[in-house]
């Protein structure tokens, strides 16, 4: 039997990201709790290659939603949805945040400080947050030679109006060229009421390439509902797109650096491969690489990162917020099978890679490192 970690009664995605019961303040000491997969529980009969996988709780934070590593810096930076960024080094958090923008956002519903990425030289932090009026804001903060985040340097790169409170997505990554990739949800409510996702004139429901200097935007993909977390690996952008009524999806935007035409992922003409809004057309949409139905497996996919070391090297690791299940899939075949590794992890809101490590972040506060 898979080891169960206990699931909190909080929901993400199809039902919206809700406020969790979180610990007061910040645990700066770290912990040593470890959960191991028992032999034979890899999901593949006779395959013991994943038997030594474990989740190690390294500490807790108020509503952690993202983590990033910075060039020429051995520390990690964890994001609290309430609007702060925290440095983690030598097994513990620093006592004070390195950046606090809590006055510019509110960590409630599906809003807050949602994403962090660093420039390739480590001199700039890029943020994705919802402003107090709910609009998506892509911003930059300078990091000086001493590694200090210069709060006064914060500048807005791009603002995107949000018509509803949910489906803000919130992640961003930096390409080798230095441009940003930003995933946008369809604007929210339910059923894509404004029909934004397939609308070429809207920035909602899209993957955007953003110039961090002038804020200019190029649309790379459309037809997305709420791609909450994304991961760029080997020129492929992995998208965990939260579903509506029935299906959760993992999709891939291939050859990102060479995209010449807008790629269509189908929403809201389709939910996964099932017809959805009959008035929407998507005749050549790219099907998800994996889709799973609402039920025992859950109801809200939490992406997702490609592991670069260990037994899961080269596999995409993802979770479901409702069921607390953690899976991986092979990245080198067209129709991979989901292999389940953990069950009942408490409210896993994100699976993210920082440096060569993969972390599972619980909205309830716990930060797990994937070992093995």
Specify the residue positions occupied by each region the protein language model found.
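Bacterial signal peptide processing site
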Residues: 15-19
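Beta-propeller domain segments
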Residues: 22-43, 82, 111-113, 179, ...
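Beta-strand-rich domains and repeat architectures in extracellular enzymes and scaffolds
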Residues: 54-83, 299-306
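Surface loop/turn motifs at the tips and blade-to-blade linkers of beta-strand repeat domains
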Residues: 56-62, 99-108, 157-164, 218-223, ...
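Conserved beta-strand position repeated across blades of beta-propeller domains
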Residues: 68-69, 117, 173, 231, ...
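Blade-loop segments of beta-propeller domains
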Residues: 94-122
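Asp-box/WD-like beta-propeller blade repeats and closely related beta-sheet repeat scaffolds
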Residues: 137-174
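Conserved blade-ending motifs and adjacent loop-strand segments that build the rim/top face
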Residues: 335-355
């Amino acid at each position: 039997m898979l080891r169960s970690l206990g699931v909190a009664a909080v929901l993400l995605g199809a039902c919206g990201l809700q406020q969790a019961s979180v610990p007061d303040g910040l645990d700066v000491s770290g912990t040593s709790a470890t959960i191991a997969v028992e032999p034979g529980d890899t999901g593949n009969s006779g395959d013991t290659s994943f038997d030594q996988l474990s989740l190690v709780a390294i500490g807790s934070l108020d509503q952690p939603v993202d983590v990033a590593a910075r060039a020429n810096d051995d520390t990690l930076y964890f994001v609290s949805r309430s609007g702060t960024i925290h440095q983690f080094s030598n097994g513990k958090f620093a006592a004070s945040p390195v950046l606090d923008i809590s006055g510019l956002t509110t960590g409630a519903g599906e809003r807050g400080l949602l994403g962090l990425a660093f420039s390739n030289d480590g001199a700039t932090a890029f943020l994705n947050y919802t402003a107090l009026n709910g609009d998506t804001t892509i911003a930059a903060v300078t990091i000086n030679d001493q590694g200090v985040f210069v709060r006064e340097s914060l500048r807005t790169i791009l603002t995107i109006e949000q018509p509803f409170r949910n489906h803000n997505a919130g992640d961003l990554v930096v390409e080798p060229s230095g441009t940003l990739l930003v995933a946008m949800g369809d604007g929210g409510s339910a059923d894509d009421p404004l029909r934004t996702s397939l609308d070429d004139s809207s920035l909602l429901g899209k993957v955007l390439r953003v110039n961090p200097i002038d804020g200019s935007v190029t649309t790379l993909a459309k037809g997305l509902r709420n791609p909450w977390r994304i991961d760029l690996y080997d020129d492929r952008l992995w998208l965990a797109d939260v579903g509506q009524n029935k299906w959760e999806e993992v999709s891939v935007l291939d050859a990102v650096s060479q995209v010449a035409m807008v790629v269509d992922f189908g929403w809201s003409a389709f939910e996964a491969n099932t017809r959805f809004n009959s008035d929407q057309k998507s005749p050549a949409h790219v099907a998800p690489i994996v889709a799973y139905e609402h039920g025992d497996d859950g109801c809200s996919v939490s992406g997702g990162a490609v592991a670069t070391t260990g037994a899961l090297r080269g596999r995409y690791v993802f979770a479901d917020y409702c069921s607390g299940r953690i899976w991986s899939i092979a990245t080198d075949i067209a129709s991979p099978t989901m292999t389940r590794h953990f069950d009942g992890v408490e409210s896993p809101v994100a699976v993210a890679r920082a440096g060569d490590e993969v972390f599972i972040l619980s909205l309830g506060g716990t930060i797990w490192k994937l070992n093995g």
